[in-house]
């Protein structure tokens, strides 16, 4: 839970990625009170939900990340999230979306496909998520997306739920050093 993470990592940023679609203020407030530093709201939510999450972010001092997953126009979705007050954009190609498109024999989409356009469309920090290799994720800052996410698919084997070496901390340190250019 968020509160357990906050207790064990008192100085670390914690993103509560609930992908909020409704009940925006309530969900964001619950996560803020538990110790989250950032919450995530979806662009496909009603704009009133986005506004409620943004207001909660202001009231409780947490950052609001707007996620454009599933938007028919990803660039416009990012723009709308910024216009509604989100301080960060998560440019996101979903797991099911990628897998389904690939299973149908088509090229799997990547957040890199429209990353340049999303970055140019907004003035807030952008993070690219979904189907990236470690090398692509590490390179995101050079594409104008300074926030790097290392989710489970990038850091562990999906079948064994372990890193190749079995040492998650060492793997994460190596990746962070690459992102920060201190390898």
Please annotate each region the language model reported.
Residues 1, 26-29, 51-54, 77-80, ...:
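Short secondary-structure transition/capping segments
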Residues 36-48, 89-101, 143-171:
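Glycine-rich phosphate-binding active-site loops on the catalytic face of alpha/beta enzymes
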Residues 23-34, 72-84, 121-124, 128, ...:
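Catalytic cores of alpha/beta
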Residues 1-19, 52-70, 106-128, 166-183:
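Alpha-helix-loop-beta-strand connector modules within alpha/beta enzyme cores
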Residues 78-91, 121, 135-137, 170-183:
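Long, contiguous secondary-structure blocks with strong helical propensity
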Residues 26, 48, 76, 110-113, ...:
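Conserved active-site and cofactor/substrate-binding residues in soluble primary-metabolism enzymes
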Residues 71-121:
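Active-site rim beta-loop-alpha module in soluble metabolic enzymes
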């Amino acid at each position: 839970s968020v509160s357990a993470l906050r207790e064990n990592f008192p100085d670390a940023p914690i993103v509560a990625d609930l992908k909020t679609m409704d009940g925006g203020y309530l969900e964001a407030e619950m996560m803020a009170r538990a110790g989250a530093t950032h919450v995530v709201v979806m662009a496909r939510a009603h704009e009133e939900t986005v506004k409620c999450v943004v207001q909660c972010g202001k009231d409780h001092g947490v950052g609001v990340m707007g996620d454009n997953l599933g938007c028919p126009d990803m660039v416009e979705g990012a723009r709308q999230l910024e216009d509604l007050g989100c301080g960060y954009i998560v440019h996101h190609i979903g797991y099911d979306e990628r897998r389904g498109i690939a299973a149908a024999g088509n090229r799997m989409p990547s957040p890199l496909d429209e990353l340049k356009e999303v970055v140019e469309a907004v003035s807030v920090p952008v993070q690219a998520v979904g189907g990236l290799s470690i090398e692509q994720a590490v390179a995101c800052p050079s594409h104008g997306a300074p926030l790097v996410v290392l989710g489970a698919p990038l850091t562990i084997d999906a079948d064994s739920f372990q890193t190749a070496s079995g040492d998650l901390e060492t793997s994460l340190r190596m990746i962070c050093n690459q992102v920060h250019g201190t390898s």
